[in-house]
Amino acid sequence: MRRIYAAWTLVAAAGVMDCSPRLEKAAAFTLGPDSQVIVFPFMFQGYNIAVLPTTKYGDLKGNARRRVASFLEHNISHAVWYFVVGGIAYKDDRSERLFSEMMDGYLKKISAGASKVYKGGRKMFSESLETVHEMIFECNKAGDGHVVKYGKSIINRLSDMIENALGEVSAEEKRKYRRFWSRVKERAGFLYSTERLRRVVEAEKIVCNACKEICLELEEEELMGLLAEGSVRKALKAKVDEDEISRGLYLECTVVNTSLLLDAHREHGGDVTRELVKQMLLGKKGEEIDRRYINKVANVVKERQRSEMEKRDREQDPERRRLRARRVGSL
């Protein structure tokens, strides 16, 4: 079954970074059973890049440093949660209380820890984003990490709601009620699927590392030309006025088949996955990347590598001939 996950957009309110519930559904994603929202390690303010994957805390100056530090300390974990998981739990007051009891403090603690480490100056932003994913979706060997426990609690809560459907309503209303909550329950099963949680973390690492390498390879002007307008920015433009966009910090993301991405990395290596990520940054939709497209990209990368090797050989040949001539002349 296909699923809808609501994204969470971060906006500035009175100069303070704040999660804005009214923008919760600014960007919605339709996911297949192996698809997942992956967050790019770039932070945007308005139409400009505020933080690159390679940005360290010491690279930030003045107001930008304060705003980014505030975002990391108060918002980063909640932003990742709402991108990756969506609004599964927020369908009634009891589910919302369960989130507040089990997840809210947990996410705040992770944000505070990630902010403290980032401000230590050694980590790049991409590395901090990886760490946040690892800490939120950690799965120990026993398969009973915090999110897994929360997922099981949500499932129990939903099972009770389905079993004890509304009393004084028609049979048709009960049927619709049970069908709706059964779908929500199916979506919530993601939270205690340790295999899927591990895929989320592994895929995020691949994307973060690829973005970091792309940034290290390109000049700033080239990088600005590389980044296409993403889904979150498009959604913001449709929902929010220009002034609010210019003041807000937000992350970009895409939907990708994590199984295919991980398979591509194992089969073809980092050069191919880096090219796949580059194409997504250029505007290729992650959900359009299938095996056929991956093989096409792999062939292009292989041909490029072959051409570069031939070029290096041609450039080295004259030097080799000169060295050979010198050796012969000295005999």
UniProtKB/Swiss-Prot annotation:
Renumbered residue ranges of the record's region Disordered: 305-331
Name of one Pfam family that matches: DUF3654
Biased composition (Basic residues): 321-331
The family this protein is said to belong to: Belongs to the UPF0329 family.
Taxonomic source organism: Encephalitozoon cuniculi (strain GB-M1) (Microsporidian parasite)
Protein name per its UniProtKB record: UPF0329 protein ECU01_0080/ECU01_1530/ECU02_1560/ECU04_0090/ECU08_0010/ECU08_2090
InterPro entries for this protein: DUF3654
Organism placement in taxonomy: Eukaryota, Fungi, Fungi incertae sedis, Microsporidia, Unikaryonidae
Compositionally biased region (Basic and acidic residues): 305-320
